[in-house]
Regions:
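Catalytic machinery of carbohydrate-active enzymes
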Residues: 1-358
Length: 358
């Protein structure tokens, strides 16, 4: 009977491994046999931006445990860097069934959704971190998750928080965040070309939308148009960014300002479009996380979130309205009009000039 290494990092179990396909190796005398040092499961299902800003954990675990095998469960597999993660699973019935019977050394759930917490409860692991299902709700699996959990329950605790998101999730896992970067594929290998971008100029991207959930974040389109005009007058190439939801808005801003708008694209192509920019002006959105993941300069407009939450990695600046926001983590302004109208174009423009000079 043919011998095989069940603990080898390359072994798939259902198909031939890469060393066999490329070199014909068999397990008995395989020169590249690599014993798995740790099996690690990360459950991070939710919003694309939150998935991106959880990726610094990968580098830390790779450094701690060379030859570890990392499995990641998510709703959006396409956003994860395939070359950095051994097994990427989309959250569905098949993946949930598999994981309930798999075994790990470390299992982490960073989502408070009940299905994610229930899965961590069911997973077999020597160490568990984050949230599990207790009394039919998501609760901390241990005291390490208490801080992050409490910031999600009490607004005053969240407003007093001085830790950024990565510091919080690292602490949940018993780790210390040391500025590890986001990991994101720029999709440069896909052959995307952008002939309509003037590369002789510094390219400033304006990410104009903010999604449906937190509309209090939205900067008025007239303000974006005014900023675009000032940047164009200064000699920058101004590129409007957004998805299908922002298409009509971006067309209007283009018509008002003369900024460049190329349309909306599938996610990998949109990521590559952002990669063409030197700096991006954005609200707190997926586009913000993509910008940081691509290591671009950034001017971040924020009103309803604790600014301590965001690590810009020394490549940007946060600008806020001139009056205090009273709608902390609210999707709609309780005063009837968002304070983003109190964030003047001149303030954002001056921040762009400072950051581009970094």
């Amino acid at each position: 009977m043919e011998f095989y290494h069940s603990d080898c990092l390359y072994l798939k179990g259902d198909v031939p491994c890469l060393p066999h396909k490329e070199n014909g190796y068999h397990c008995m005398d395989c020169p590249v046999y690599t014993k798995i040092s740790k099996r690690i499961l990360i459950i991070k299902l939710g919003a694309i931006g939150d998935v991106i800003r959880t990726t610094p954990l990968i580098s830390t675990y790779r450094n701690m445990f060379p030859n570890c095998k990392i499995t990641w469960l998510t709703m959006t597999p396409a956003i994860l860097p395939a070359g950095k993660i051994d097994e990427i699973l989309k959250f569905d019935y098949a993946s949930a069934m598999y994981l309930q019977h798999a075994e790990f050394d470390i299992a982490i759930n960073l989502d408070k959704e009940k299905e994610a917490s229930a899965l961590l409860l069911a997973v077999k692991a020597r160490e568990k971190y984050g949230y599990v299902l207790k009394e039919n709700i998501s609760q901390p699996v241990n005291e390490l998750a208490n801080h992050k959990y409490h910031t999600g329950l009490f607004d005053d605790v969240s407003q007093a928080n001085t830790l950024n998101y990565c510091q919080e999730i690292f602490a949940m896992c018993g780790l210390t965040y040391q500025g590890e970067p986001y990991l994101l594929d720029n999709h440069a290998d896909k052959g995307y070309v952008w002939p309509d971008i003037d590369r002789t100029k510094t390219v400033i991207g304006l990410n104009t939308g903010c999604g449906d959930r937190w509309t209090t974040r939205l900067w008025p389109k007239e303000f974006f148009a005014g900023l675009a005009k000032k940047l164009l007058d200064k000699g920058y190439e101004v590129l409007l960014l957004g998805g299908e939801q922002e298409d009509a808005r971006n067309r209007e801003i283009r018509d008002l300002s003369g900024a460049n708008y190329l349309g909306f694209f599938p996610l990998p192509q949109f990521i590559n479009l952002i990669d063409q920019c030197h700096l991006v002006v954005t609200q707190v959105t997926m586009g913000m996380h993509l910008t940081l993941g691509l290591r671009k300069k950034i001017v971040l407009m924020n009103n309803i979130f604790n600014p301590n939450e965001f690590d810009l990695f020394g490549r940007g600046e946060i600008v806020m309205p001139d009056k205090d926001c009273v709608c902390f983590y609210r999707g709609k302004c309780k005063l009837g009009e968002s304070c983003m109208k109190d964030l003047p174009v001149s303030k954002v423009y001056e921040a762009v000039e400072r950051v581009i000079a970094l």
